């Protein structure tokens, strides 16, 4: 399992697309957080805070993570190596988890350079160090859980097709709906007392809490459950090839 985990990370980092994805992620964040005069611009925000990063990152993740996961199973299917992979002395779940943790690790690798933003704000804030570090680290944890949820979706879409582009598009659609769809339905106020429950089904309400540095057990359970559902759907998808 560990060998497969390392193989997935190496395969991504040894490809041009891997570096392009990471560079694009950092470039978009840098431009919106420091250059473009938008609501996310940290200097215009008026005080030392990483809140802008945690507000914008989910929207970048909608494209970044599907780009990371789109090849994980679809490429194996297209090249025919999926059959060899599934005959290895590993269970389907072990194969899925190796790829899942590889995907999460790649998300972490993409996030790590943003610590430069944190260091910059910490040093140049007035006074220096005038930033809520506890809340910031809590927000990073929330971003990690969000990334893990998106990775689980990307794995599933990659497992149901041998076309990487199709897997990429499907992952974007499902992650976008999971993050924004329930919030939009809630805003329409169509179901009365059920609206709040509908909102709680979406990722955004749980991420919003964690992005403020609030680590709530209910949010952790939600993210674990969400990832587990899509991991099981991926397992079912792989097992269907044996029927």
Residue positions per predicted region:
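Alpha-helical transmembrane segments of multipass membrane proteins
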Residues: 8, 116-120, 152-156, 176, ...
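Aromatic- and glycine-rich beta-strand/loop motifs that create alpha-glucan
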Residues: 1-20
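Hydrophobic/aromatic residues in alpha-helical transmembrane segments
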Residues: 65-69, 117, 153, 233-234
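Terminal transmembrane helical anchor/hairpin motif
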Residues: 36-48, 167-237, 243
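Secretory targeting signals
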Residues: 30-34, 47-60, 98, 102-162
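Hydrophobic alpha-helical membrane-insertion segments
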Residues: 16, 22-27, 95, 103-111, ...
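Helix-loop-helix units of permease transmembrane domains in multi-pass membrane transporters
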Residues: 72-102
């Amino acid at each position: 399992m560990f060998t497969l985990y390392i193989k997935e990370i190496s395969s991504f980092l040894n490809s041009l697309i891997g570096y392009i994805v990471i560079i694009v992620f950092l470039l978009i964040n840098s431009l919106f957080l420091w250059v473009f005069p938008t609501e996310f611009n940290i200097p215009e925000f008026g005080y030392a805070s990483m809140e802008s990063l945690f507000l914008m990152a989910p929207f970048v993740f909608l494209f970044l993570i599907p780009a990371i996961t789109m090849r994980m199973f679809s490429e194996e299917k297209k090249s025919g190596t999926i059959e060899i992979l599934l005959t290895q002395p590993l269970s389907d779940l072990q194969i899925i988890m190796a790829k899942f943790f590889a995907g999460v690790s790649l998300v972490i690798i993409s996030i790590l350079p943003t610590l430069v933003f944190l260091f910059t704000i910490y040093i140049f804030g007035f006074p220096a160090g005038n930033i809520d570090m506890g809340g910031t680290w809590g927000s990073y944890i929330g971003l990690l859980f969000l990334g893990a949820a998106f990775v689980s979706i990307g794995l599933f879409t990659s497992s149901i097709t041998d076309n990487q582009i199709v897997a990429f598009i499907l992952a974007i659609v499902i992650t976008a709906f999971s993050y924004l769809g329930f919030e939009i339905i809630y805003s329409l106020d169509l179901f009365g007392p059920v609206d709040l429950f509908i909102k709680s089904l979406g990722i955004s309400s749980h991420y919003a809490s964690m992005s403020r540095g609030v680590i709530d057990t209910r949010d952790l359970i939600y993210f674990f459950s969400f990832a587990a559902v899509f991991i099981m759907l991926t397992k079912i998808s792989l097992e269907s090839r044996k029927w």
